[in-house]
Design a protein with these regions (language model features):
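Transmembrane alpha-helices and adjacent helix-loop boundaries
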Residues: 4-190
Length: 190
């Protein structure tokens, strides 16, 4: 859910910045700066504790999804924008001179290369976001950290519970990292 919402938002934000859409570009830049320069924990607190003060109720799961999507969308947008800007302008000019439309140029020439260039940053951001879920327990959303704290409270085995937490994160993140390496190799352009 978070991933699909982020994919749409990050591509849209990156395209707005890349195409330099006048008013929307400033709005997107403001969103990216706000999101990237405030900690996820503060964003979660604002959503979970602040929004109900103005009549918008959220449960912990919605808070987690919205907070992670808000943060992740900005990081992914910047990763994709940097991939778009890494493409030499001559490639777009060449494609247009060969008779491709702007849409075809983006779809067949620019976007595949931008995805390839952006893939390492995308995967690093995915891993970063998965690790950021450890703060969800602050808004009563059960996550691995919440479970580890419960184990510590029940059995007073701090070292063992934290070691188990590390193993769980490795079991989750190592396959994601390997998938990222595989995707990077598969999408690499010569």
């Amino acid at each position: 859910l978070v991933g699909s919402e982020m994919c749409i938002r990050d591509r849209l934000c990156a395209a707005i910045q890349y195409e330099r859409v006048p008013v929307l570009r400033q709005i997107v830049a403001g969103y990216i700066e706000l999101s990237r320069n405030t900690p996820l924990l503060i964003q979660l607190f604002f959503i979970y504790y602040g929004l109900p003060k103005i009549g918008i109720k959220t449960d912990p799961a919605v808070c987690g999804v919205v907070g992670l999507a808000f943060l992740g969308g900005s990081y992914m947008a910047e990763a994709f924008r940097s991939g778009l800007e890494a493409i030499e302008p001559i490639q777009q000019e060449s494609a247009l001179s060969l008779g491709l439309t702007r849409g075809q140029t983006m779809r067949y020439v620019i976007l595949p290369q931008a995805m390839s260039i952006s893939m390492p940053a995308f995967m690093a951001n995915v891993i970063f976001l998965l690790k950021e879920t450890s703060v969800f327990s602050a808004v009563s959303l059960m996550d691995l950290m919440f479970t580890a704290k419960d184990l510590i409270a029940m059995y007073a085995k701090t070292t063992e519970a934290l070691a188990l937490l590390v193993v769980c994160y490795l079991l989750i993140l190592l396959p994601v990292s390997l998938l990222g390496s595989w995707l990077e190799r598969r999408l690499r352009y010569a």
